[in-house]
Amino acid sequence: MIYNNTYDVIVVGGGHAGVEAAAASARIGAKTLLLTHNIDTIGQMSCNPAIGGIGKGHLVKEIDAMGGIMAKAIDMAGIQFRILNSRKGPAVRATRAQADRVLYKKAINSLLNDQENLDIFQDSVDDLVVENDTVCGVITKTGIIFKSKKVVLTVGTFLGGKIHIGQVSKEGGRAGDQPSNALAARLRALPFRVDRLKTGTPPRIDSRSVDFSVMDVQHGDTPTPYFSFFSKGKIEHPRQIPCYITYTNSKTHEIITNNLDKSAMYSGLIEGIGPRYCPSIEDKVVRFAEKDRHQIFVEPEGLNSIELYPNGLSTSLPFEVQCEYIRSIKGFENAFIMRPGYAIEYDFFDPRDLKPTLETKHIKNLFFAGQINGTTGYEEAGAQGLVAGINAAISIDSDKSWYPTRSNSYMGVLIDDLITKGTKEPYRMFTSRAEYRLILREDNADLRLSDKACELGLLNKQDQEIFINKKTAIDENIAIMKNTWIGPQTQKARDLEKFLDKKMTRESTLFDLLKRPELDYKKLQQIPDTNLKLEDESVIEQIEISAKYSGYIERQSKDIAKISTLESKTIPESFDYSQVKGLSNEVLQKLSEQKPTTLGEASRIPGVTPAAVSLLTIYMKKTGFIK
């Protein structure tokens, strides 16, 4: 049957990409349907019970700045918060939160249920309705046809999913869930490049069988940080609890080495490539044979759960081997495994077949987001879901689009890397992937992106007000500091001497004084009549960073301005690269296959040389494609 409602946007899949896509689309005002095989698993943390980390925390803050729900959900569900790299510079500081799985899922569902323009329906999607290379709906397992103007696929590891525990394999999208084999077959029949990837999860351990007294304790930060720019004073964190640290040892490694032939990964049972930066324990033992131990983070799954997640012990070894090596680890001598670890292999589609909006190049109005694009991690999935949902919604009645860039966000770095370079292994975000790290900090994600979120209708009125007030306070107080002068012979200068390494020798503004490493805003506040009255720590932080890193920030801003010239030069989708004289066959093939949308994107395709970009630019100027 054909369902009588036609939707603007249908999102298939209720994982971390799906919920952000559906929420973003609905916030913009599009009539949105979220289709999931099981309503009870919406927002489920299928792997580790945590959000954030190096590079990943930046993505969460950016999702939040664009009105997304991940940061607010973890603020409602986080049971331990830490700022990583807190002693390093602001560019690489990152927030990480341990989650209560049940509370996180509950928070996501609460945020979705409060969202207008959003319907949720339980059924698996088996087929797409495609007419003239344009998607116009989906067909479910029960035969219901849902019509829509746009479709966003956020299907995670469910496409042709296969679970491996030792030499035992079974079909599954994750433990306890059936795979989406019919949809996988349908997508394979379309003109997309497809391959296989692998990821894994560790065994879960009964906390009552663990000796925590022999492990290192890891407490969260005090005061407890917030992930969302809009949570403080509105959301109260749950009770905070510690995590623990233990280590593998030579006996652990010996057990694993002696049983490698039984591992699904090493026996050849798994074809897909696993994540380089989150390897299985057997992979770590083989690749880092010189190490005599590996760190294991023992993470609680929730305030009312007895399950522990031993982060660092992902495996595809047989269950009996898992039991043996787990019990060789300090504190786990009597451990009882409640759920075995496993590897999962699944289809992904070459992200080079996507536009920067995450719409597919071959099928109009069809968007891909999350693990279907070859990424790993909740945060990477959420960022893609947000971008896909935005573009699906704003392009319903126009050619309007918006996508992040390398110079304004880690989301932009993520998507640009995927669509220009593709990936052969699960892609994980790191700060090292970004060229403009000092500008793309966690702390200023709202200042970088929330103006655009307001413009697109993604922020509610309350959050808009919080953002505008913060931005105004920063601008006004920087202006005050740049216009307040202190001379070397004044009383204010003498008051400052107790803080200074050396006396003032010339007149300076308060802003210039703030550049000195020995001074901060609160010290300057102690000087009488400076008119510095701020108490908001987030505003003070922005002012201090603006002053202390001003030289570096200005330099990166100039670099961005140079690059933006190429980014602003768009290339028509129908552009014929064979007309550009002097391009090598390799460059011609790559440009013709990938169809970059801008000269900047073309310049980042592996194998496309600066000389080739120059030839392309000259030709486009000559023929009037660019002015």
Swiss-Prot record:
GO function terms (MF aspect): flavin adenine dinucleotide binding
Alphabetically ordered keywords of this record: Cytoplasm, FAD, Flavoprotein, NAD, tRNA processing
Listed GO CC annotations: cytosol
Protein residues bound to FAD: 13-18, 125, 180, 371
Protein's cellular compartments: Cytoplasm
GO biological processes: tRNA methylation; tRNA wobble uridine modification
Alphabetical list of InterPro entries matching this protein: FAD/NAD-bd_sf, GIDA_C_N, MnmG, MnmG-rel, MnmG-rel_CS, MnmG_C, MnmG_C_subdom, MnmG_C_subdom_sf
Binding positions for NAD(+) per the UniProt entry: 274-288
Cofactor(s) this protein requires: FAD
SUPFAM superfamilies linked: FAD/NAD(P)-binding domain
Protein function: NAD-binding protein involved in the addition of a carboxymethylaminomethyl (cmnm) group at the wobble position (U34) of certain tRNAs, forming tRNA-cmnm(5)s(2)U34.
Quaternary structure (record): Homodimer. Heterotetramer of two MnmE and two MnmG subunits.
Family designation: Belongs to the MnmG family.
HAMAP family in the cross-refs: MnmG_GidA
PANTHER family: GLUCOSE INHIBITED DIVISION PROTEIN A (PTHR11806), PROTEIN MTO1 HOMOLOG, MITOCHONDRIAL (PTHR11806:SF0)
Annotated protein name in UniProt: tRNA uridine 5-carboxymethylaminomethyl modification enzyme MnmG
Name of encoding gene: mnmG
